[in-house]
Amino acid sequence: MKEIKIKKPIKIRKPTRSYTGIMWITNGTNKKYLAPDFDNRCAYCDDSDEYSGGYNSFHVEHFAPKEKFKHLEFTYDNLLYSCSYCNISKSNKWIGSNENESVLGNKGFIDPCNDDYYNHLGRDQNGNIISLTPLGEYIYYELKLYLKRHFILYNLDQINIRRRALKAKIKEKEEHGEDTRKLVKVHRLVCEIFCDYYDLLVKEEA
């Protein structure tokens, strides 16, 4: 019997480009606005820059490639905050003949700020990115979303959320003079698991 995959959204929160001011003609300035708009996460894979070298290691990605559509090079609605892996994988790939033709049949790319992006890609119960449609499969392979680092970083993120919540709960109980020994043990275990995943990431990128 075929195993049923439990689908989760590929991203924790759908990003929204909020900047509507003047057009900045440097990637550096645009990046300052893109980072918070995308929660410091890659637009495509949702990897956090926290575990990927930080803000300076992330790129300004041009959804419609600047090599083909020079007039969109600094248009904010065409820009994305991206990890180096997704940005380099996508490069100047573009299926259409104009800037608005991003998909032809089951090939092409969807702007991650578009709701439709989440109909084509998701995650399984373990945090691996999975394709949900033929178009999603095209994006999955073109952006190399099968890389193990995406699974590791997703789980690092989830464990860190739990670690921080436990730390806050321990602090709250300590302030009320309550017994925290059980929570401290759980927190220590979660920290060990976090370190194990971090070691996996280091080995993956070695």
PLM region spans:
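Short cysteine-rich clusters marking metal-coordination/redox-active sites
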Residues: 42-45, 83-86
